[in-house]
Amino acid sequence: MPKHILIFDSGIGGLSVYKEIKYQLPLAKYIYAFDNAAFPYGELTESVLIERTTHIISKLCSKFPIDIVVIACNTASTVVLPSLREKLDIPVVGVVPAIKPAALVSNKIGLLATPATVKRSYTYDLIKSFAPISDVQLLGSTRLVEMAEEKMIGIDVDITELKEILSPWQNKVDTIVLGCTHFPFLKNEIKKALGNKILLIDSGEAIARRVKQLLNGDEVESAVLFEGEVFCSAPSIKEEALNHTFKELNFSSLQCLGYPKF
């Protein structure tokens, strides 16, 4: 019986976390779910965010023998973890902006995240705790989330537009914390926009290590490679392109849970 790992995000950016976990635990059974009906999460109220994530995750936990849940969304992680941990009797892991490792290597740090993550008191508490003497500049962008989603279905990133978004940081930061799971997919483009000397840090590898630790390093009793399953909350006009993306990552075709935004 394989270990069942549920990875959840508002979009497909959480696949950056999936890749890191898959590298650590290649023989687990993966279920990926994303709430495209309410994408992007950065624009939801906390109560709606909690209600939606709890509903979708509970539904999938009743459908599969889930061993661990990974909230692969920084915005959701700052809000929903307490309620999910209270409701579920399995480990729930969230993602946290990698402020601590960034502060160990630089004092000119940029935190790139969604507008919601940038505004949360949780984010400021992280900076106060782990980078109290660093110059940490915050930049929130919903458009970057959209650009990452577009790239993953084959649409080229407009470097000129990206440079404009990142222009406040030109020559002002040397280390960027990628505080959204979508942003690792834009690493090459960010370096083109700000220069190759920029150090980019994300929390994907640390999350993967934590998941492996919580599962005691166990995966499956045999060496069978399991095909993952993927669920969305609403039909998508991009279904064909999405299926291509997921197929390359060893997932079956997209399935719809049918959970509209309103």
From Swiss-Prot:
Molecular function in Gene Ontology: glutamate racemase activity
Q: Does the keyword Isomerase apply?
A: yes
The protein's annotated catalytic reaction(s) are:
L-glutamate = D-glutamate
UniProt pathway:
Cell wall biogenesis; peptidoglycan biosynthesis
Q: Which InterPro entries match?
A: Asp/Glu/hydantoin_racemase, Asp/Glu_race, Asp/Glu_racemase_AS_1, Asp/Glu_racemase_AS_2, Glu_race
For binding substrate, which residues are annotated in this chain's numbering?
9-10, 41-42, 74-75, 181-182
Annotated active site: 73 (proton donor/acceptor), 180 (proton donor/acceptor)
Q: Its Enzyme Commission number?
A: 5.1.1.3
One Pfam family this sequence matches: Asp_Glu_race
Any one GO BP annotation for this protein: regulation of cell shape
EC category name: isomerase
Recite the UniProt keywords alphabetically: Cell shape, Cell wall biogenesis/degradation, Isomerase, Peptidoglycan synthesis
Family listed: Belongs to the aspartate/glutamate racemases family.
Described purpose of this protein according to its UniProt entry? Provides the (R)-glutamate required for cell wall biosynthesis.
- The protein here is known as Glutamate racemase
